[in-house]
């Protein structure tokens, strides 16, 4: 598990494994902290319009968004399957957007 990997996760594991409970996310935790039992992730979606707190991406041929306004911490047991990694240009754009989002 490393930064910018895209994973299928269980959103709410306490409610069981149902299809509606699954989602895509990208890991945003710096690799130096990935030994911890939980990771910081940003959910991914194909169904939300473009707004400033969303980063556009194409993953597995689908246009979508990374929702940096919906970041959350997920226990590692909620990670089901690694699906790939974000393209380099999306990684750069995501980091730039985080700097803007959390600017003081």
Identify the function of each model-found stretch.
Residues 1-104:
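Conserved functional hotspots at enzyme active or ligand-binding sites that engage polyanionic ligands
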